[in-house]
UniProtKB/Swiss-Prot annotation:
Its biological purpose: This is one of the five types (D1 to D5) of receptors for dopamine. The activity of this receptor is mediated by G proteins which activate adenylyl cyclase.
Topology with respect to the bilayer: Multi-pass membrane protein
Species this chain originates from: Oreochromis mossambicus (Mozambique tilapia)
Disulfide bond listed as a keyword: yes
Name of the protein described by the UniProt record: D(1)-like dopamine receptor
Length: 386
């Protein structure tokens, strides 16, 4: 979400002096090399974002069963928002990074609105997915009754509506800027006023990240409790049959520890990637409007630094398909689309591992039967399938 930046000479360094011989050739060559390297890196990022999210959308279009699960609708809508980032936001900025100047004139305001809308929609969908997981794991039976397709569509609609409201309306009415009109067509500067910087950052990042931290913390606690209950039942079984209880108990404790570690690693990856990509940008986004600068003074944050953090945030859109759409159903669809089903085949146990089930929770027949049988064996519902 690039809501404070300028595209004049951001990543490629200062323009070389025109003309000249000898000593001016080396800076010019270095500048061109840096621009070429920047262009290659950004092209790779854009293409990977396009391919990853397009693959998710293609899988949903091709396979009807992926459209039948409400939780997959959130992953699909997330992929669409990230696809919009790759199409409506990244390419225009990449061209400007390489050229060192904004080349698209009056399109600047529309582009800024697209940037805010798409980035906010992506982050809000990550928040919705975390809430969906928490509800599914904490109250699975109530979740099955209440998480209907209609309710899922309402949640998706709220995310997109909120994203549009905080982007296009303020930008088109110029409520977001610091009170000066853009006069240079080669400068797409969207420096924010303090009110809009704080309010938009709260809606787009800080409130969603607090919700995600809360839901994933609760998920870890629920998972740890269920793992320990299962482990205690497994240790009790050999005692009932008078088997080698000591060895089985030690093995069960090791298994329980491995499961808890896997839960923690999975949740750490989900939250760690998101925070690593977006936190630096939003910290600067709230800090920069409070800088008091003289007209001729240097900015308190360099354009290059801000540009790097902006691209880190957008890079999250290339990682989301890997984190959120690699459950067993999607992986099978991907292997079929890519024509590698013979080589990508995995066993049933490997295909439905914990990290994938947690990354995109869904009930299938096998898991429901397993949950029912284990739940009946201890007189209660099995709430956390591994």
């Amino acid at each position: 979400m690039e809501i404070f930046t300028t595209t004049r000479g951001t990543s490629a360094g200062p323009e070389p002096a025109p003309g000249g011989h000898g000593g001016t050739d080396s800076p010019r060559t270095s500048d061109l090399s840096l621009r070429a390297l920047t262009g290659c890196v950004l092209c790779i990022l854009i293409v990977s974002t396009l391919l990853g999210n397009a693959l998710v959308c293609a899988a949903v279009i091709k396979f009807r069963h992926l459209r039948s699960k409400v939780t997959n609708a959130f992953v699909i809508s997330l992929a669409v928002s990230d696809l919009f980032v790759a199409v409506l936001v990244m390419p225009w900025r990449a061209v400007s990074e390489v050229a060192g100047v904004w080349l698209f004139g009056a399109f600047c305001d529309t582009w800024v609105a697209f940037d805010i809308m798409c980035s906010t929609a992506s982050i809000l969908h990550l928040c919705i997915i975390s809430m969906d997981r928490y509800w599914a794991i904490s109250s699975p039976f109530r979740y099955e009754r209440r998480m209907t397709p209609r309710f899922g569509c309402v949640m998706i609609g709220v995310a997109w509506t909120l994203s549009v409201l905080i982007s296009f309306i303020p930008v088109q009415l110029n409520w977001h800027a610091r009170g000066r009109e853009r006069t240079d067509p080669g400068d797409c500067n969207a420096s924010l006023n303090r009110t809009y910087a704080i309010s938009s950052s709260l809606i787009s990042f800080y409130i969603p990240v607090l919700i995600m931290v809360g839901t994933y913390t609760r998920i870890f606690r629920i998972g740890r409790t269920q793992i320990r209950r299962i482990s205690s039942l497994e240790r009790a079984a050999p005692r009932a049959t008078r088997g080698p209880a000591l060895c089985d108990e030690e093995s069960s404790l090791k298994t329980s520890f491995r499961r808890e570690t896997k839960v923690l690693k999975t949740l750490s990856v989900i939250m760690g990637v998101f925070v690593f990509c977006w936190l630096p940008f939003f910290v600067l986004n709230c800090m920069v409007p409070f800088c008091r600068l003289e007209p001729a003074a240097a900015p308190c944050v360099s354009d290059t630094t801000f540009s790097v953090f902006v691209w880190f945030g957008w890079a999250n859109s290339s990682l989301n398909p890997v984190i959120y759409a690699f459950n067993a159903d999607f992986r099978k669809a991907f292997s079929t689309i890519l024509g590698c089903s013979r080589y990508c085949r995995t066993s049933a146990v490997e295909a439905v591992d914990f990290s994938n089930e947690l990354a995109s929770y869904h009930h299938d027949t096998t898991l429901q039967k397993e949950a029912s049988s284990r739940g009946n064996s201890r007189g209660g519902p099995y709430q956390f399938a591994l």
